Amino acid sequence: MDKLNKITVPASQKLRQLQKMVHDIKNNEGGIMDKIKKLKVKGPPSVPRRDYALDSPADEEEQWSDDFDSDYENPDEHSDSEMYVMPAEETGDDSYEPPPAEQQTRVVHPALPFTRGEYVDNRSSQRHSPPFSKTLPSKPSWPSAKARLASTLPAPNSLQKPQVPPKPKDLLEDEADYVVPVEDNDENYIHPRESSPPPAEKAPMVNRSTKPNSSSKHMSPPGTVAGRNSGVWDSKSSLPAAPSPLPRAGKKPATPLKTTPVPPLPNASNVCEEKPVPAERHRGSSHRQDTVQSPVFPPTQKPVHQKPVPLPRFPEAGSPAADGPFHSFPFNSTFADQEAELLGKPWYAGACDRKSAEEALHRSNKDGSFLIRKSSGHDSKQPYTLVAFFNKRVYNIPVRFIEATKQYALGKKKNGEEYFGSVVEIVNSHQHNPLVLIDSQNNTKDSTRLKYAVKVS
């Protein structure tokens, strides 16, 4: 019955019973902990005494003195504090700072000789070099370009150095040589420019050589040679070269003056005959004379006479401009020959249109039946068309004419195509060899031989 009653007890009552049991356990544990605290020694638990410290600080010192030795407090207050602070200030600061100062000086010194590594005297003046190194970078930044130009002029500086034999003075001169020669170089670079105008004045001296008219041809080349040797002389030598052809032009127009007073047509032929003679002279002469003579012709209007002269020569020489009409004649002759060969053939339909040709092949209704007709476009590159019948379809194959080789080929231009000397050869070849037929609509290929010739009624 007791078990049944316990089962039937509602859950709320069970929870209340559990809460009471937990509360009782906590109360019992609290009593046990209080008993343990009373049994403990007052000395060791320092933390609870600090939390509940109600006594004076004097009592606390007495408690520490009773539990622990007095030797632990004295070294912290007197001996250890003094001994720990003093050595840190004396030994640590003095011994650690000097070495980095020495290393910095060692790093600076090797960098200086690299800037002047080519000079040997700088090694003895390493101590004096650092102050100069600070002043040098300001100046060499911009004159570095001129200093490179100064490298070509060390001779004047070398002449000044032997004048001062003592070595300590050489060091001072080396330092001065790095700054002063920059100014000297500017002066030395300007002096040649000042000296250059006198040779410019000598240029007209070359013009005086033109006085002898016969030797003017020989004197003109040296002026050009001098212009090639020096870049400054080019602009000035070209100026005297221009007036030099003027006297030559004065001599040579004498010949056109003889031709100009005779403008009539019969004399024009004489003028044409006289032209090749100076042309041959120009070929034998130098190119420089050609350039001088070229400006002489336009005022005399000789090229006007030269233009009508070559016009009749072009058709004679067979130039490409005139070849067009001449090639048309051989084309017509070849077509006439082809027509003569094709007229007697049973498969040649002549000027038959496409519709009538296809109707004739459909009436025959035989695979391999064919005929050849003239192309409807009347194109010289595609003069004929081969019409073939196979599998109830009619194929129109163009016959191309190749002007370069004067041969014939079937279809569009392709690699490995066959060439024939005439249309008759095409028919004879494909009567024994199959002809490939391509249907562009269905993308199909067939082949047949030309077996049955068809006539158009």
Swiss-Prot record:
Here the segments flagged for biased composition (Polar residues) are 207-218
- Which keywords appear in this protein's UniProt record, sorted alphabetically? B-cell activation, Cell membrane, Cytoplasm, Membrane, Phosphoprotein, SH2 domain
Fetch the InterPro entries from UniProt.
Answer: Immunoreceptor_sig_adapters (IPR051751), SH2 (IPR000980), SH2_dom_sf (IPR036860)
Q: How does it assemble?
A: Associates with PLCG1, VAV1 and NCK1 in a B-cell antigen receptor-dependent fashion. Interacts with VAV3, PLCG2 and GRB2. Interacts through its SH2 domain with CD79A. Interacts (via SH2 domain) with SYK; phosphorylated and activated by SYK. Interacts (via SH2 domain) with SCIMP; this interaction is dependent on phosphorylation of SCIMP 'Tyr-120'.
Basic and acidic residues bias: start-end ranges: 272-290
All residue ranges annotated as the SH2 domain in the record: 347-454
Q: Which residues carry this modification: Phosphotyrosine?
A: Y72, Y84, Y96, Y178, Y189
Q: What is this protein called?
A: B-cell linker protein
Pfam families xrefs = SH2
Q: In which tissues is it expressed?
A: Expressed in the spleen and weakly in thymus, no expression was seen in liver, testis, or brain. Expressed in B-cell lines representing different developmental stages from the pre-B to the plasma cell stage, but not in a T-cell or a fibroblast cell line.
Q: Which GO terms describe its molecular function?
A: lipid binding; molecular condensate scaffold activity; phospholipase binding; protein tyrosine kinase binding; SH2 domain binding; signaling adaptor activity
Q: Spell out the GO cellular component terms annotated for this protein, sorted alphabetically and separated by semicolons.
A: cytoplasm; cytosol; intracellular membrane-bounded organelle; plasma membrane
Fill in the PTM field for this protein.
Answer: Following BCR activation, phosphorylated on tyrosine residues by SYK and LYN. When phosphorylated, serves as a scaffold to assemble downstream targets of antigen activation, including PLCG1, VAV1, GRB2 and NCK1. Phosphorylation of Tyr-84, Tyr-178 and Tyr-189 facilitates PLCG1 binding. Phosphorylation of Tyr-72 facilitates VAV1 and NCK1 binding. Phosphorylation is required for both Ca(2+) and MAPK signaling pathways. Phosphorylation of Tyr-96 is required for the binding of BTK.
According to the lineage, what is the superkingdom?
A: Eukaryota
Protein localization:
Cytoplasm; Cell membrane
Q: Where is the composition biased (Acidic residues)?
A: 57-74, 172-187
An annotated GO BP? B cell activation
Whether Phosphoprotein counts among this entry's keywords is yes
Q: Explain the purpose of this protein.
A: Functions as a central linker protein, downstream of the B-cell receptor (BCR), bridging the SYK kinase to a multitude of signaling pathways and regulating biological outcomes of B-cell function and development. Plays a role in the activation of ERK/EPHB2, MAP kinase p38 and JNK. Modulates AP1 activation. Important for the activation of NF-kappa-B and NFAT. Plays an important role in BCR-mediated PLCG1 and PLCG2 activation and Ca(2+) mobilization and is required for trafficking of the BCR to late endosomes.
Q: What is the effect of changing Y96F?
A: Fails to induce pre-BCR down-regulation, leading to splenomegaly and leukemia
Q: Where is this region: Disordered?
A: 36-306
